[in-house]
Amino acid sequence: MLKTFSKNNLTRRTTLGATLGLAATLFATSALPTMAQDAKTVTLGYAPWSDAEFVTKLAAKVITDKLGQKVELVQTDVAPLYQGVSRGDLDAILMAWLPVTHADYYGKVKDKVDTLGTIYEGARQGWVVPAYVPESEVASFEDLKKPEVQEKLSGTVQGTEPGAGLTRLSQQALKDYALDGYKLQISSEAGMLSAVERAYRNEKWFVATAWSPHWMFGKYKLRDIDDPKKAIGGTEHVNILSRKDFKSDNPAAAELLSRMKIPLGDLEAGMSDAQGTSYDEAVAKYIKDHPDQIKTWVGDEG
């Protein structure tokens, strides 16, 4: 049970046994070691982003099936997630974008959390335009200053939720590049994607905040625009953070999470599958298609 999240911050909390079906629960309670069955429920938090949802539900499914432990999932905004894991309300989060995107959040809690490992590397973020926008007209942030470009883009950058690190960096980018005629449309991942879908379908110009890994790069032909001042940052890695006593309280789950490594190509394929089916089905397919990878994560615990 979470102790400090308010109803305004807490978006969704579910127990994986209910989410992923009775069969997994029966398997967990009857076919696995007694030690695992007696362990406390693992509480994992994630932000409402496609990559965070996929990797968190994947970790939850593996912990449930292989360790026989119940998993509770909490979806909320970024700031409450960092606060939750630092206070011990959450056992772990699998979406700490570093060294730039979440630098402010991490800096406030780094002495109160443990880093279990890096789940994937080579993550990146920036602003994108559709491939049908000529590169001769828009190649970099500087090109957005052109009056004719600003007019075609309606002076708007399609953004994501207010608490995202990318939102903070994008607001700073508007200042760094003196893009005074632009506004950042703060919304959500879903809102940004809806705006992109509408514009792309009608071949209208747009510029949007974006990050990779993300399934949108498989659905749409998009192009990053150059950021010569590095206002948005460069390549990032995504870490797993846990509360301070998690490794001693639940060494099996902590060890499993510390071994989780996902190649970006595999992650993007899984996220794409989730768009065609559901995250639960895509997670089940990922586990079936990557037995050696899962075996490495589980080690001697499963």
Where are these regions (language model features)?
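Immediate post-signal peptide segment of exported/extracytoplasmic ligand-binding proteins
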Residues: P33-L44, K146-S154, Q293-G302
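N-terminal export leaders
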Residues: R12-L16
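A conserved helix-loop-strand patch within extracytoplasmic ligand-binding domains
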Residues: D111-T160
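A bilobed periplasmic-binding-protein/Venus flytrap-type ligand-binding module shared by bacterial periplasmic
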Residues: Q125-E135, E236-D249
